[in-house]
Amino acid sequence: MAKLLEITGKAISGEWGQDDDTGTGIPVLRTTNFTNEGFVNYKNVVTRSISKKNIAEKYLRHGDVIIEKSGGSDKQPVGRVIFFEGEENKYLFNNFTGLLRVQNPEEWLPKYVFYALYAYYRNGGTRAFENRTTGLHNLQVDNYVKSVDIPKLSCRKQQHICETLDHVRAAVAYREQQLTKLDELVKARFVEMFGDPISNTKRWDVIELGSLTGIGSSKRIFEKEYVSEGIPFYRTKEIVELSKGNPISTELYITEKRFLEIKEQYGVPQKGDLLISAVGTIGVIWIVDEKNDFYFKDGNLIRVDSSDRFNSTYMKTLLESLIAEYKKQMSSGTAYSALTISGLMKMKIYDVPLSLQNQFADFVAKVDKSKLFVGSAAAHKPFDIGFFSQKHCATPCKRGIISSKHMIFH
Protein backbone atom coordinates (compact mmCIF):
# COMPACT_ATOMS: atom_id res chain seq x y z
CA MET A 1 0.00 0.00 0.00
CA ALA A 2 1.02 3.57 -0.59
CA LYS A 3 -0.52 6.81 0.56
CA LEU A 4 -1.81 9.06 -2.20
CA LEU A 5 0.54 11.71 -0.82
CA GLU A 6 3.52 9.49 -1.71
CA ILE A 7 2.24 9.12 -5.26
CA THR A 8 1.18 12.66 -6.16
CA GLY A 9 2.44 14.90 -3.40
CA LYS A 10 0.13 17.61 -2.11
CA ALA A 11 -2.71 18.77 -4.31
CA ILE A 12 -1.79 21.84 -6.34
CA SER A 13 -4.18 24.76 -5.92
CA GLY A 14 -5.97 26.24 -8.91
CA GLU A 15 -6.14 29.76 -10.33
CA TRP A 16 -9.04 32.07 -11.16
CA GLY A 17 -7.59 35.49 -11.92
CA GLN A 18 -9.71 38.31 -13.33
CA ASP A 19 -12.40 38.71 -15.98
CA ASP A 20 -11.07 38.30 -19.49
CA ASP A 21 -11.95 41.67 -21.04
CA THR A 22 -9.75 41.24 -24.11
CA GLY A 23 -10.73 37.73 -25.17
CA THR A 24 -7.11 36.60 -25.00
CA GLY A 25 -7.26 34.92 -21.62
CA ILE A 26 -6.33 31.41 -20.53
CA PRO A 27 -8.92 28.60 -20.69
CA VAL A 28 -9.76 27.49 -17.14
CA LEU A 29 -11.57 24.27 -16.27
CA ARG A 30 -14.18 24.47 -13.49
CA THR A 31 -16.37 21.93 -11.75
CA THR A 32 -18.93 22.79 -14.44
CA ASN A 33 -16.59 20.94 -16.78
CA PHE A 34 -16.63 17.79 -14.64
CA THR A 35 -18.77 14.87 -15.75
CA ASN A 36 -19.90 12.11 -13.44
CA GLU A 37 -18.21 9.62 -15.74
CA GLY A 38 -14.76 11.09 -15.17
CA PHE A 39 -14.45 12.82 -18.53
CA VAL A 40 -13.75 16.49 -19.15
CA ASN A 41 -16.66 18.38 -20.71
CA TYR A 42 -15.11 21.06 -22.90
CA LYS A 43 -18.37 22.94 -23.44
CA ASN A 44 -18.55 26.35 -21.79
CA VAL A 45 -14.87 26.53 -20.86
CA VAL A 46 -14.27 30.06 -19.61
CA THR A 47 -11.18 32.15 -20.28
CA ARG A 48 -9.66 34.26 -17.52
CA SER A 49 -7.00 36.92 -17.31
CA ILE A 50 -4.28 35.40 -15.12
CA SER A 51 -1.10 37.42 -14.71
CA LYS A 52 0.58 35.45 -11.93
CA LYS A 53 4.12 34.34 -12.50
CA ASN A 54 5.36 30.81 -11.94
CA ILE A 55 2.19 29.07 -13.11
CA ALA A 56 3.90 26.97 -15.78
CA GLU A 57 3.65 23.87 -13.59
CA LYS A 58 -0.09 24.38 -13.26
CA TYR A 59 -0.86 24.00 -16.94
CA LEU A 60 -2.60 20.67 -17.35
CA ARG A 61 -0.73 17.72 -18.83
CA HIS A 62 -1.91 14.43 -20.19
CA GLY A 63 -2.61 12.10 -17.26
CA ASP A 64 -3.34 14.78 -14.68
CA VAL A 65 -6.16 14.09 -12.23
CA ILE A 66 -8.30 17.08 -11.27
CA ILE A 67 -10.24 16.81 -8.02
CA GLU A 68 -13.28 18.81 -6.94
CA LYS A 69 -12.50 20.72 -3.72
CA SER A 70 -15.77 22.61 -3.32
CA GLY A 71 -19.27 21.85 -4.52
CA GLY A 72 -21.42 18.77 -4.21
CA SER A 73 -24.70 18.41 -2.36
CA ASP A 74 -26.43 16.08 0.07
CA LYS A 75 -27.14 13.75 -2.84
CA GLN A 76 -23.80 14.16 -4.59
CA PRO A 77 -20.76 14.35 -2.31
CA VAL A 78 -17.85 16.60 -3.09
CA GLY A 79 -14.63 15.00 -4.34
CA ARG A 80 -15.34 14.03 -7.94
CA VAL A 81 -12.28 13.40 -10.09
CA ILE A 82 -11.69 13.69 -13.82
CA PHE A 83 -8.82 12.42 -15.96
CA PHE A 84 -7.22 14.95 -18.30
CA GLU A 85 -6.35 13.75 -21.80
CA GLY A 86 -6.65 17.05 -23.64
CA GLU A 87 -4.17 19.42 -25.21
CA GLU A 88 -1.18 19.96 -22.95
CA ASN A 89 -0.01 23.32 -21.65
CA LYS A 90 -3.24 25.04 -22.67
CA TYR A 91 -5.65 24.72 -19.76
CA LEU A 92 -5.51 25.78 -16.13
CA PHE A 93 -7.97 24.77 -13.40
CA ASN A 94 -9.85 27.00 -11.00
CA ASN A 95 -9.58 27.55 -7.27
CA PHE A 96 -12.49 25.21 -6.48
CA THR A 97 -10.44 22.32 -7.84
CA GLY A 98 -7.03 20.83 -7.21
CA LEU A 99 -4.44 19.04 -9.29
CA LEU A 100 -3.11 15.58 -8.45
CA ARG A 101 -0.12 14.80 -10.66
CA VAL A 102 1.63 11.45 -10.46
CA GLN A 103 5.28 12.09 -9.67
CA ASN A 104 6.70 8.83 -11.00
CA PRO A 105 4.61 7.57 -13.97
CA GLU A 106 6.97 4.64 -14.46
CA GLU A 107 5.92 3.27 -11.08
CA TRP A 108 2.32 4.52 -10.94
CA LEU A 109 0.25 4.73 -14.10
CA PRO A 110 -1.77 7.97 -13.91
CA LYS A 111 -4.92 6.32 -15.24
CA TYR A 112 -4.67 3.56 -12.63
CA VAL A 113 -4.48 6.21 -9.92
CA PHE A 114 -7.46 7.98 -11.47
CA TYR A 115 -9.56 4.81 -11.61
CA ALA A 116 -8.66 4.03 -8.02
CA LEU A 117 -9.72 7.49 -6.84
CA TYR A 118 -12.90 7.32 -8.88
CA ALA A 119 -13.73 3.96 -7.34
CA TYR A 120 -13.15 5.50 -3.93
CA TYR A 121 -15.47 8.40 -4.73
CA ARG A 122 -18.21 6.18 -6.15
CA ASN A 123 -18.19 4.15 -2.96
CA GLY A 124 -18.70 7.25 -0.81
CA GLY A 125 -15.16 7.50 0.51
CA THR A 126 -14.92 11.27 0.19
CA ARG A 127 -17.82 11.85 2.59
CA ALA A 128 -15.40 11.29 5.47
CA PHE A 129 -13.46 14.38 4.37
CA GLU A 130 -16.35 16.82 3.90
CA ASN A 131 -16.80 20.16 5.62
CA ARG A 132 -20.08 21.99 5.14
CA THR A 133 -20.37 25.76 5.27
CA THR A 134 -23.30 27.88 4.05
CA GLY A 135 -24.68 24.98 2.06
CA LEU A 136 -21.40 24.27 0.26
CA HIS A 137 -19.55 21.00 0.69
CA ASN A 138 -15.78 21.42 0.92
CA LEU A 139 -13.21 18.66 0.71
CA GLN A 140 -10.46 18.50 3.32
CA VAL A 141 -7.93 17.96 0.57
CA ASP A 142 -4.82 17.68 2.73
CA ASN A 143 -6.38 15.02 4.97
CA TYR A 144 -7.72 13.23 1.90
CA VAL A 145 -4.30 13.05 0.25
CA LYS A 146 -2.65 11.92 3.50
CA SER A 147 -5.25 9.24 4.26
CA VAL A 148 -6.16 7.44 1.05
CA ASP A 149 -4.31 4.18 0.44
CA ILE A 150 -3.71 2.77 -3.03
CA PRO A 151 -2.37 -0.77 -3.52
CA LYS A 152 1.06 -0.97 -5.04
CA LEU A 153 0.80 -3.29 -8.04
CA SER A 154 3.17 -4.02 -10.86
CA CYS A 155 2.85 -1.80 -13.90
CA ARG A 156 1.63 -4.83 -15.85
CA LYS A 157 -1.25 -5.37 -13.42
CA GLN A 158 -2.03 -1.66 -13.31
CA GLN A 159 -2.14 -1.64 -17.10
CA HIS A 160 -4.44 -4.67 -17.16
CA ILE A 161 -6.90 -2.99 -14.79
CA CYS A 162 -6.86 0.20 -16.87
CA GLU A 163 -7.38 -1.64 -20.16
CA THR A 164 -10.25 -3.66 -18.73
CA LEU A 165 -11.97 -0.59 -17.33
CA ASP A 166 -11.40 1.32 -20.56
CA HIS A 167 -13.16 -1.45 -22.50
CA VAL A 168 -16.06 -1.55 -20.05
CA ARG A 169 -16.40 2.22 -20.07
CA ALA A 170 -16.44 2.29 -23.88
CA ALA A 171 -19.10 -0.43 -23.97
CA VAL A 172 -21.27 1.42 -21.48
CA ALA A 173 -20.91 4.68 -23.42
CA TYR A 174 -22.05 2.86 -26.56
CA ARG A 175 -25.06 1.41 -24.74
CA GLU A 176 -25.98 4.84 -23.41
CA GLN A 177 -25.85 6.22 -26.95
CA GLN A 178 -28.25 3.46 -27.98
CA LEU A 179 -30.64 4.43 -25.18
CA THR A 180 -30.54 8.05 -26.29
CA LYS A 181 -31.33 7.03 -29.86
CA LEU A 182 -34.28 4.95 -28.68
CA ASP A 183 -35.64 7.98 -26.81
CA GLU A 184 -35.22 10.03 -29.97
CA LEU A 185 -37.03 7.32 -31.92
CA VAL A 186 -40.10 7.68 -29.68
CA LYS A 187 -40.12 11.45 -30.17
CA ALA A 188 -39.76 11.05 -33.93
CA ARG A 189 -42.62 8.55 -34.05
CA PHE A 190 -44.82 10.96 -32.10
CA VAL A 191 -44.15 13.77 -34.58
CA GLU A 192 -44.73 11.39 -37.48
CA MET A 193 -48.13 10.35 -36.14
CA PHE A 194 -49.38 13.57 -34.55
CA GLY A 195 -47.21 16.40 -35.84
CA ASP A 196 -45.19 18.91 -33.87
CA PRO A 197 -46.58 19.06 -30.32
CA ILE A 198 -46.11 22.83 -30.09
CA SER A 199 -47.08 24.16 -33.54
CA ASN A 200 -49.79 21.55 -34.30
CA THR A 201 -48.66 20.99 -37.87
CA LYS A 202 -51.42 18.43 -38.51
CA ARG A 203 -54.16 20.85 -37.52
CA TRP A 204 -55.82 18.73 -34.85
CA ASP A 205 -58.68 20.19 -32.88
CA VAL A 206 -57.44 21.17 -29.43
CA ILE A 207 -59.09 21.10 -26.04
CA GLU A 208 -57.94 22.10 -22.59
CA LEU A 209 -56.54 19.29 -20.48
CA GLY A 210 -58.78 20.31 -17.60
CA SER A 211 -61.85 19.46 -19.69
CA LEU A 212 -60.64 15.89 -20.18
CA THR A 213 -59.89 14.76 -16.66
CA GLY A 214 -59.35 15.69 -13.04
CA ILE A 215 -56.17 17.52 -12.09
CA GLY A 216 -55.08 18.25 -8.55
CA SER A 217 -52.59 17.57 -5.80
CA SER A 218 -52.84 15.63 -2.56
CA LYS A 219 -54.17 15.98 0.95
CA ARG A 220 -51.55 17.80 3.02
CA ILE A 221 -49.42 15.57 5.24
CA PHE A 222 -47.74 17.37 8.12
CA GLU A 223 -44.22 16.66 9.26
CA LYS A 224 -45.45 15.29 12.57
CA GLU A 225 -47.29 12.56 10.64
CA TYR A 226 -44.10 11.09 9.18
CA VAL A 227 -43.08 7.69 10.55
CA SER A 228 -40.04 5.46 10.10
CA GLU A 229 -41.91 2.72 8.24
CA GLY A 230 -45.30 2.18 6.67
CA ILE A 231 -46.73 3.50 3.40
CA PRO A 232 -44.09 5.24 1.22
CA PHE A 233 -44.50 8.99 0.87
CA TYR A 234 -43.19 10.27 -2.47
CA ARG A 235 -41.74 13.66 -3.29
CA THR A 236 -40.13 14.93 -6.48
CA LYS A 237 -36.99 12.89 -5.77
CA GLU A 238 -38.82 9.57 -5.83
CA ILE A 239 -40.82 10.46 -8.94
CA VAL A 240 -37.63 11.35 -10.80
CA GLU A 241 -36.15 7.98 -9.83
CA LEU A 242 -39.30 6.08 -10.82
CA SER A 243 -39.55 7.89 -14.15
CA LYS A 244 -36.07 6.63 -15.01
CA GLY A 245 -36.91 3.08 -13.98
CA ASN A 246 -34.43 3.29 -11.12
CA PRO A 247 -34.91 1.78 -7.67
CA ILE A 248 -36.09 4.40 -5.22
CA SER A 249 -34.59 5.30 -1.89
CA THR A 250 -37.72 6.10 0.11
CA GLU A 251 -36.97 8.21 3.17
CA LEU A 252 -40.45 9.18 4.38
CA TYR A 253 -43.51 7.14 5.32
CA ILE A 254 -47.00 7.59 6.72
CA THR A 255 -48.97 5.05 8.73
CA GLU A 256 -51.22 2.59 6.95
CA LYS A 257 -54.11 3.88 9.07
CA ARG A 258 -53.59 7.44 7.79
CA PHE A 259 -53.27 6.17 4.23
CA LEU A 260 -56.55 4.26 4.43
CA GLU A 261 -58.29 7.32 5.87
CA ILE A 262 -57.11 9.42 2.93
CA LYS A 263 -57.98 6.69 0.46
CA GLU A 264 -61.55 6.48 1.73
CA GLN A 265 -62.17 10.22 2.02
CA TYR A 266 -60.20 11.71 -0.87
CA GLY A 267 -58.87 8.89 -3.02
CA VAL A 268 -55.28 7.95 -3.82
CA PRO A 269 -53.36 7.60 -7.10
CA GLN A 270 -54.58 4.81 -9.36
CA LYS A 271 -52.92 2.84 -12.14
CA GLY A 272 -52.53 5.02 -15.23
CA ASP A 273 -52.57 8.33 -13.36
CA LEU A 274 -49.77 10.75 -14.18
CA LEU A 275 -47.69 12.27 -11.38
CA ILE A 276 -45.81 15.37 -12.52
CA SER A 277 -43.05 17.18 -10.64
CA ALA A 278 -44.15 20.79 -10.14
CA VAL A 279 -41.20 22.49 -8.41
CA GLY A 280 -37.45 22.10 -8.63
CA THR A 281 -37.01 19.58 -11.41
CA ILE A 282 -40.19 20.58 -13.23
CA GLY A 283 -42.00 18.36 -15.70
CA VAL A 284 -40.76 14.88 -14.85
CA ILE A 285 -43.69 12.51 -15.39
CA TRP A 286 -44.30 9.04 -14.00
CA ILE A 287 -47.20 6.81 -14.99
CA VAL A 288 -48.50 5.19 -11.81
CA ASP A 289 -48.34 1.41 -11.69
CA GLU A 290 -49.97 -0.92 -9.20
CA LYS A 291 -46.85 -2.35 -7.63
CA ASN A 292 -47.10 -0.65 -4.25
CA ASP A 293 -49.38 1.58 -2.24
CA PHE A 294 -47.99 5.08 -1.75
CA TYR A 295 -49.01 8.67 -1.16
CA PHE A 296 -47.39 11.90 -2.32
CA LYS A 297 -46.52 15.42 -1.21
CA ASP A 298 -48.84 18.30 -2.02
CA GLY A 299 -47.26 21.23 -3.82
CA ASN A 300 -44.34 19.15 -5.06
CA LEU A 301 -46.38 16.94 -7.36
CA ILE A 302 -49.50 17.30 -9.50
CA ARG A 303 -51.78 14.37 -10.25
CA VAL A 304 -53.51 13.98 -13.62
CA ASP A 305 -56.22 11.34 -13.31
CA SER A 306 -56.31 8.55 -15.87
CA SER A 307 -59.29 8.60 -18.21
CA ASP A 308 -60.92 6.45 -20.87
CA ARG A 309 -60.66 9.52 -23.12
CA PHE A 310 -56.88 9.30 -23.51
CA ASN A 311 -54.00 6.85 -23.36
CA SER A 312 -51.62 7.63 -20.49
CA THR A 313 -48.48 6.90 -22.54
CA TYR A 314 -49.60 9.24 -25.30
CA MET A 315 -50.52 11.93 -22.78
CA LYS A 316 -47.19 11.63 -20.96
CA THR A 317 -45.25 12.14 -24.20
CA LEU A 318 -47.37 15.10 -25.25
CA LEU A 319 -47.22 16.77 -21.84
CA GLU A 320 -43.43 16.44 -21.67
CA SER A 321 -43.17 18.67 -24.75
CA LEU A 322 -45.89 21.07 -23.64
CA ILE A 323 -44.39 21.48 -20.17
CA ALA A 324 -40.92 22.06 -21.65
CA GLU A 325 -42.39 24.91 -23.70
CA TYR A 326 -44.27 26.17 -20.64
CA LYS A 327 -40.98 26.29 -18.71
CA LYS A 328 -39.33 28.37 -21.44
CA GLN A 329 -42.10 30.94 -21.36
CA MET A 330 -42.23 30.92 -17.57
CA SER A 331 -38.48 31.40 -17.07
CA SER A 332 -38.45 34.68 -18.96
CA GLY A 333 -41.23 36.23 -16.93
CA THR A 334 -40.91 35.10 -13.33
CA ALA A 335 -38.22 34.84 -10.70
CA TYR A 336 -39.74 31.68 -9.19
CA SER A 337 -40.50 28.80 -11.51
CA ALA A 338 -43.22 26.29 -10.77
CA LEU A 339 -45.81 24.30 -12.66
CA THR A 340 -49.27 25.17 -11.38
CA ILE A 341 -52.47 23.17 -11.43
CA SER A 342 -54.24 26.01 -13.23
CA GLY A 343 -51.47 26.22 -15.82
CA LEU A 344 -51.70 22.50 -16.46
CA MET A 345 -55.48 22.58 -16.73
CA LYS A 346 -55.28 25.25 -19.45
CA MET A 347 -52.75 23.40 -21.60
CA LYS A 348 -54.07 22.73 -25.09
CA ILE A 349 -54.21 19.03 -25.89
CA TYR A 350 -54.63 17.47 -29.34
CA ASP A 351 -58.05 15.88 -29.71
CA VAL A 352 -56.86 12.81 -31.62
CA PRO A 353 -58.63 9.45 -31.96
CA LEU A 354 -57.98 7.07 -29.09
CA SER A 355 -57.13 4.34 -31.60
CA LEU A 356 -54.13 6.39 -32.79
CA GLN A 357 -53.06 7.04 -29.23
CA ASN A 358 -53.15 3.29 -28.55
CA GLN A 359 -51.06 2.61 -31.66
CA PHE A 360 -48.44 5.01 -30.38
CA ALA A 361 -48.50 3.42 -26.92
CA ASP A 362 -47.95 -0.02 -28.49
CA PHE A 363 -44.92 1.36 -30.32
CA VAL A 364 -43.53 2.84 -27.09
CA ALA A 365 -44.01 -0.51 -25.32
CA LYS A 366 -41.87 -2.23 -27.97
CA VAL A 367 -39.19 0.44 -27.64
CA ASP A 368 -39.26 0.07 -23.86
CA LYS A 369 -38.53 -3.64 -24.23
CA SER A 370 -35.50 -2.77 -26.32
CA LYS A 371 -34.44 -0.21 -23.72
CA LEU A 372 -34.64 -2.83 -20.99
CA PHE A 373 -32.30 -5.07 -22.96
CA VAL A 374 -29.86 -2.27 -23.74
CA GLY A 375 -30.18 -0.73 -20.29
CA SER A 376 -29.30 -3.96 -18.52
CA ALA A 377 -25.78 -3.46 -19.80
CA ALA A 378 -25.66 0.32 -19.54
CA ALA A 379 -26.81 0.15 -15.93
CA HIS A 380 -23.54 -1.54 -14.96
CA LYS A 381 -21.29 1.48 -14.94
CA PRO A 382 -17.57 0.78 -15.18
CA PHE A 383 -17.25 2.58 -11.86
CA ASP A 384 -20.03 0.57 -10.23
CA ILE A 385 -17.33 -1.11 -8.24
CA GLY A 386 -19.44 -3.86 -6.76
CA PHE A 387 -20.30 -5.03 -10.28
CA PHE A 388 -16.78 -4.71 -11.61
CA SER A 389 -14.91 -6.30 -8.74
CA GLN A 390 -17.16 -9.33 -8.47
CA LYS A 391 -17.55 -10.17 -12.14
CA HIS A 392 -14.85 -8.62 -14.28
CA CYS A 393 -11.85 -7.66 -12.21
CA ALA A 394 -8.53 -9.43 -12.46
CA THR A 395 -6.84 -11.18 -9.56
CA PRO A 396 -5.45 -8.02 -7.92
CA CYS A 397 -8.93 -6.79 -6.97
CA LYS A 398 -11.05 -9.92 -6.96
CA ARG A 399 -11.82 -9.54 -3.24
CA GLY A 400 -13.44 -6.15 -3.71
CA ILE A 401 -12.43 -2.60 -4.33
CA ILE A 402 -12.85 -1.20 -0.84
CA SER A 403 -11.89 -3.39 2.06
CA SER A 404 -11.03 -0.81 4.70
CA LYS A 405 -11.80 2.79 5.48
CA HIS A 406 -9.38 4.41 3.07
CA MET A 407 -8.31 1.51 0.84
CA ILE A 408 -9.17 1.57 -2.85
CA PHE A 409 -8.38 -1.84 -4.32
CA HIS A 410 -7.63 -5.06 -2.48
Feature names for model-found ranges:
Residues 2, 16, 90-98, 126-156, ...:
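A short glycine-rich beta-alpha junction/loop motif
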Residues 30, 56-118, 235, 259-260, ...:
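A short beta-sheet element
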